[in-house]
């Protein structure tokens, strides 16, 4: 019966990725039938996506009915509480490779249709053929033969020489089978290199035909109107697929050197680069074409993973130009691989890889029409708006940044590194790195590593650059005067002053007003920098800096110069605005305090008035009670009225006041007969001080003012005048009338000065003469000069020929001719020529303003017409008395003011303004006052706030106590230990105490203690916001400035008081009214500033005493100690944070490094075990991969500073011919 059946044993082991129809985990079981016979089913596994059935059954069918052995039918059932549902089914054909009596494992694929889409799953089974199948011995023999064949192929691929080949052929069968299994990928691809060459040539031909067809198509379109037929494009197949390119890449990675050599010898390497060029230069790219670019690059990378392949790639002309054009691809994988290949050329031996890389990037800029070199690389680092970065995108950015690090940090010359880094600064790399630094190490270890490399290399270069100026110790490089002085001192002994003068003269001729001029200045700066850093010519060595690129850099920097100027201007405006706001805040606080004080005072006064009113009410009540009592008393007594009248004597006169004054005047005479009025009361006694009675009124003003009013009737005669020379303390006599000088000295009243000696009379010329321009002196000015000695006697021998002089110096008489040309006349200049020229230049600033407008503005105090510097200039240009006299003398002769020059005309105008100098001085003070007041108030407020912040801080004392205990422990057992306190400057010396390894200071340790045990003290610096500003204030300077301001104000105040009142239509001088109001407000301000400056000095001395400091300590020293300590504390806190972060990063890197070392050790151990067994171990080259790993870890840059630059910079790798 068994001979008529096919029998198999089926083991259903488990399922994978099984879900229900709704896409969630279900409770499945499986039904299976073979040839339509009895169904077998497994048990139900509750809620499992990977149910383990472990079910076995025997299946059989009749050979007669099923000669072809049908497939196994599987049904996957979803079991539910009240229903069952088939969720998938399939038929699995029995494999032809079944071996009689041997179990073979298989996987049955299935698909489940869910509400969320199709779900792939599989069933793991084992089939044992019981009475049919292949013979085991026959199959083992076939397998043995196959392994021997494949091993022979493997020997050809792996054995590089005859010795290695001989060693491999001695391996036993088991080792050979193991090697074949290990190199299955290599053996699976059995194509010969010539097959791939054919594929590459076909693809290149197809692309060229497509390109030619496109040209023909466009040509035919242009001729369509002529009715010509377009040529037929030859039919080509679909071309090289992505899968076929992948096969080439796999072959290049897995095959041996003989295969690679044969591949190159057949021209496939050249075809590969040519094909990549066709893909790159395509105008538009599809997803498939981009994938083909990637696979071409993978092929090149696998070729370059060994030194032989590197030689092949370098031997192809423009191979790397093709690779560099892959940059900027829409597919980031292409960019990453292209960058990786370009990065490696900087580390290859025997070539100047960096120079080649810079040349390639210059070529890329020209081909892609970029405005700036490297701009596309920097743009790729920027995050797109609204796009959230993932770990993959951050890794991509780390590759771009590694490329920048290679470009900038590979050269051995610091000047080249600085120049290249500066290019990236201008492209905005610093701002981008600041944003990228926000991502943590865990989010992207690769990006964090590259940012660290960039910053560390930048810091080291800056330090190295600063060492170049070590010979100029103490030189302030930011001060141009100091730099120029040092330069002159340096070149003078060498005789280079002439060269410096020529350079300076040329610089003097450079324009500065337009963009071209600014660009020239920047270019000159860059060229001199290049000369100072290099001994090569600009633009010759492109590895240093091409001249064209230097010009582009200068153009960009020139554009930034006006922007920097605008930024500085805006900063200054912002500072002025902030200063103004601060001043207003201070004044607001002052006014609030005044209001509070007034409110308190008003409340106090009201209380006093209420108390006084209460007392008066009580007194009135008492008086009323007394009156009532007196009325009762008068009612009982009846005295005689006459007796009463005689008994009451008049009150005695009041005693004279102390002070020894004059006795009171006698009592007035009795009243006249008929006078009904009572006698007037006696006059009051004289006031304390005993001064004489007031003096008589002054004589009336010139012009006849009304006499003073008579004394009131009945008041007695006026008091007598004081005796001459009385000094009893009375008021001083009134001043003389305004405009009158003091009386002449005794004996000199009405006397005249000595007259000038008689002079020789000089006749007046009959003709108009050419004038002699001189400044004449009148008789008053020659007193005591040599001119006072000239008289009739000294001049009697001077007899000039006046007729001859008249003929020689007579003004030329020009006959009037009929002419339309205007008559040219020159203005007369009397003032000193230099002063006149400066005044003319100054007046030209007042465009559209007449001299009357200017002088009227001065007269009325109109500040809108002037700038602050105008007032100073006007004071300097005020005409002297001699100038006015000379101008007046000219006008007496000429009678025409229009003949005078503008400076002379203006001088006459401004001289006519009453008390012009006093007005200008007042305006000058007012212009400067607001700025001075603001500066003083800000300084005083900062000082006050700083003092109060330290004095009122609760954290400072506790912090000092911590420092005291910490210091006592460190100094324990020494003379400095067991201290009760310390000088305040100790807090600035904590940073000088270093740890045992010199990596940390006592400040670092203090911050750790504070953060751990006293976290509330960590923010102590936030409470000391004004301390730094207070340290910049000099108390002595503030006091001096307050005194100077008060002195200037008093002078202005006096000058305003002496101004005349208005005359004519204006009864009041508007200038005086305006400035009197200003003086009133200013007086209050200055009083407040004075009192505040005195108060802060008192508070400061109290603060010094509080900390045990010398009372003479300067604020800059005292507050500076706190400022320095705060800076050190803040720096130490950040250092601790950075050290903590860095330690964490190092720990993670070490863990990753250790893991990699363990994996490498396992591989090495495995290789060693195989070697001991007699197996030949292939050591696979991976030049590119190893270099990329080194760059990604940052190790590639660590030894750059120790490497000497190769002297042979023009050598290249020679193509290798095998």
UniProtKB/Swiss-Prot annotation:
FH1 domain residues: 652-737
Annotated coiled-coil segments of the chain: 563-638, 1034-1061
Domain annotation C2: ranges: 1-108
Gene Ontology biological-process entries: 'de novo' actin filament nucleation; actin filament polymerization; actin nucleation; cell migration; cortical actin cytoskeleton organization; mitotic cytokinesis; negative regulation of bleb assembly; sorocarp development
Domain FH2, chain residue ranges per copy: 759-1155
Gene knockout outcome: No visible phenotype. ForA and forB double null cells also show no phenotype.
Cited Pfam families: C2 (PF00168), Drf_FH3 (PF06367), Drf_GBD (PF06371), FH2 (PF02181)
Biased composition range(s): Pro residues: 649-747
Family: Belongs to the formin homology family. Diaphanous subfamily.
Domain-level remarks: The DAD domain regulates activation via by an autoinhibitory interaction with the GBD/FH3 domain. This autoinhibition is released upon competitive binding of an activated GTPase. The release of DAD allows the FH2 domain to then nucleate and elongate nonbranched actin filaments.
Protein name as it appears in the record: Formin-A
Species for this entry: Dictyostelium discoideum (Social amoeba)
């Amino acid at each position: 019966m068994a001979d008529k059946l096919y029998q198999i044993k089926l083991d259903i082991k488990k399922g994978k990725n099984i879900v229900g129809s709704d896409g969630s985990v279900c409770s499945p079981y499986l039904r299976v039938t073979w040839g339509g016979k009895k169904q077998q089913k497994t048990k139900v596994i509750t809620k499992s996506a990977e149910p383990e059935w472990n079910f076995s059954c025997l299946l059989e069918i009749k050979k007669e009915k099923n000669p072809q052995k049908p497939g196994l039918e599987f049904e996957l059932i979803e079991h539910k509480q009240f229903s069952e549902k088939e969720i998938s089914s399939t038929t699995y054909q029995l494999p032809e490779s079944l071996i009689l009596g041997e179990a073979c494992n298989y996987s049955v694929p299935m698909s489940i249709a869910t509400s969320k889409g199709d779900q792939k799953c599989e069933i793991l089974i084992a089939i044992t053929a019981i009475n049919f199948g292949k013979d085991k011995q026959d199959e083992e023999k076939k397998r043995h033969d196959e392994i021997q064949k494949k091993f022979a192929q493997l020997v050809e691929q792996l054995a590089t020489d005859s010795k290695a080949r001989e060693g491999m052929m001695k391996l036993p069968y088991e080792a050979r089978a193991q090697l074949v299994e290990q190199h299955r990928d290599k053996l699976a691809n059995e194509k010969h290199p010539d097959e791939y060459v054919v594929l590459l040539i076909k693809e290149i031909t197809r692309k060229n035909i497509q390109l030619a067809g496109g040209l023909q198509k466009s040509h035919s379109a242009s001729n369509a109107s002529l009715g010509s037929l377009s040529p037929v494009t030859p039919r080509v197949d679909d071309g090289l697929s992505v899968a076929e390119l992948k096969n080439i890449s796999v072959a290049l990675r897995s095959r041996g050197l003989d295969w690679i050599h044969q591949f190159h010898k057949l021209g496939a390497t050249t075809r590969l680069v040519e094909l990549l060029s066709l893909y790159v230069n395509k105008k538009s790219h599809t997803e498939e074409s981009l994938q083909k670019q990637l696979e071409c690059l993978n092929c090149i990378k696998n070729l370059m993973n060994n030194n032989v392949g590197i030689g092949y790639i370098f031997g192809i002309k423009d191979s790397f130009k093709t690779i560099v054009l892959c940059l900027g691809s829409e597919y980031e994988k292409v960019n990453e691989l292209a960058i990786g290949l370009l990065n490696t050329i900087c580390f290859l031996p025997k070539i100047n890889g960096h120079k080649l890389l810079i040349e390639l990037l210059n070529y890329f800029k020209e081909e892609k029409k970029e405005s700036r070199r490297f701009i596309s690389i920097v743009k790729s680092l920027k995050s797109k708006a609204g796009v959230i970065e993932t770990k993959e995108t951050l890794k991509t950015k780390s590759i771009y940044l590694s490329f920048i690090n290679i470009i900038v940090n590979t050269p051995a010359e610091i000047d080249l590194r600085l120049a290249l880094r500066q290019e990236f600064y201008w492209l905005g790399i610093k701002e981008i790195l600041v944003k990228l630094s926000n991502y943590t190490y865990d989010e992207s270890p690769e990006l964090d590593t590259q940012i660290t490399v960039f910053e560390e290399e930048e810091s080291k270069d800056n330090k190295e650059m600063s060492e170049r100026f070590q010979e100029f110790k103490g030189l302030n490089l930011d001060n141009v005067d100091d730099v120029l002085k040092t330069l002159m001192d340096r070149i003078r002994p060498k005789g280079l002053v002439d060269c410096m003068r020529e350079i300076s003269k040329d610089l003097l001729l450079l324009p500065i007003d337009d963009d071209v001029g600014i660009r020239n200045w920047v270019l000159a700066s860059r060229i001199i920098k290049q000369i100072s850093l290099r001994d090569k010519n600009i633009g010759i060595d492109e590895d240093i800096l091409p001249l064209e690129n230097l010009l582009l850099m200068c153009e960009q920097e020139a554009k930034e110069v006006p922007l920097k100027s605008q930024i500085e201007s805006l900063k200054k405006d912002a500072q002025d605005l902030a200063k103004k706001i601060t001043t207003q805040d201070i004044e607001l606080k002052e006014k609030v305090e005044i209001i509070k004080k007034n409110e308190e005072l008003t409340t106090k006064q009201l209380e006093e008035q209420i108390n006084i009113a209460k007392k008066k009410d009580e007194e009135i009540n008492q008086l009323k009670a007394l009156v009532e009592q007196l009325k009762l008393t008068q009612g009982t007594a009846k005295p005689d009225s006459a007796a009463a009248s005689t008994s009451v004597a008049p009150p005695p006169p009041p005693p004279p006041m102390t002070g020894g004054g004059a006795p009171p005047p006698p009592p007035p005479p009795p009243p006249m007969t008929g006078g009904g009025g009572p006698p007037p009361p006696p006059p009051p006694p004289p006031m304390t001080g005993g001064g004489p009675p007031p003096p008589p009124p002054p004589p009336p003003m010139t012009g006849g003012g009304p006499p003073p009013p008579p004394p009131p009737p009945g008041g007695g005669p006026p008091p007598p005048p004081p005796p001459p020379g009385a000094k009893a303390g009375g008021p001083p006599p009134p001043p003389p009338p305004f405009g009158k000088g003091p009386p002449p000295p005794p004996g000199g009243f009405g006397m005249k000065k000595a007259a000038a000696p008689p002079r020789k009379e000089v006749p007046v010329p009959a003709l108009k003469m050419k004038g002699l321009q001189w400044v004449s002196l009148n008789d008053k000015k020659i007193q005591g000069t040599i001119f006072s000695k000239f008289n009739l006697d000294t001049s009697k021998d001077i007899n000039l020929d006046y007729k001859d002089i008249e003929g020689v110096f007579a003004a030329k008489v020009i006959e009037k001719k009929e002419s339309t040309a205007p008559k040219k006349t020159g203005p007369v200049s009397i003032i000193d020529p230099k002063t006149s020229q400066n005044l003319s230049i100054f007046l030209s600033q007042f465009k559209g303003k007449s001299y009357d407008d200017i002088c009227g503005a001065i007269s009325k105090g109109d500040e809108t017409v002037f700038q602050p510097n105008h007032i100073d200039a006007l004071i300097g240009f005020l005409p002297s008395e001699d100038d006015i006299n000379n101008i007046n003398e000219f006008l007496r002769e000429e009678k025409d003011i229009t003949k005078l020059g503008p400076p002379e005309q203006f001088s006459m105008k401004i001289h006519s303004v009453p008390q012009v100098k006093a007005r200008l001085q007042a305006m000058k003070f007012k212009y400067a006052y607001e700025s001075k007041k603001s500066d003083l108030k800000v300084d005083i407020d900062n000082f006050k706030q700083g003092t109060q912040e330290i004095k009122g801080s609760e954290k400072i004392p506790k912090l000092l106590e911590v420092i005291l205990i910490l210091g006592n422990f460190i100094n324990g057992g020494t003379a400095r230990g067991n201290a009760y306190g310390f000088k305040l400057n100790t807090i600035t010396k904590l940073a000088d105490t270093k740890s045992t390894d010199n990596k940390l200071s006592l400040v670092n340790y203090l911050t750790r203690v504070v953060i751990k045990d006293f976290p509330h003290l960590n923010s102590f610096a936030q409470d000391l916001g004004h301390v730094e500003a207070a340290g910049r204030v000099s108390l002595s300077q503030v006091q001096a400035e307050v005194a100077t301001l008060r002195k200037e104000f008093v002078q202005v105040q006096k000058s305003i008081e002496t101004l005349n009142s208005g005359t004519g239509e204006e009864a009041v001088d508007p200038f005086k009214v305006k400035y009197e109001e200003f003086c009133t407000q200013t007086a209050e301000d200055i009083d407040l500033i004075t009192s505040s400056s005195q108060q802060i000095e008192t508070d400061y001395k109290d603060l010094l005493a509080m900390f045990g400091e010398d009372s003479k300590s300067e604020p800059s020293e005292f507050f500076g100690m706190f400022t320095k300590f705060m800076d050190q504390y803040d720096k130490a806190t950040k250092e601790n944070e950075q050290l903590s972060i860095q330690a964490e990063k190092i720990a993670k890197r070490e863990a990753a490094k250790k893991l990699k070392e363990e994996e490498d050790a396992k591989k090495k151990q495995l290789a060693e075990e195989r070697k001991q067994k007699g197996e030949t171990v292939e050591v696979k080259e991976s030049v590119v991969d190893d270099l990329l790993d080194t760059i990604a870890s940052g190790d590639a840059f660590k030894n750059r500073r120790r490497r000497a630059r190769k002297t042979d910079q023009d050598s290249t790798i020679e193509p290798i011919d095998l």
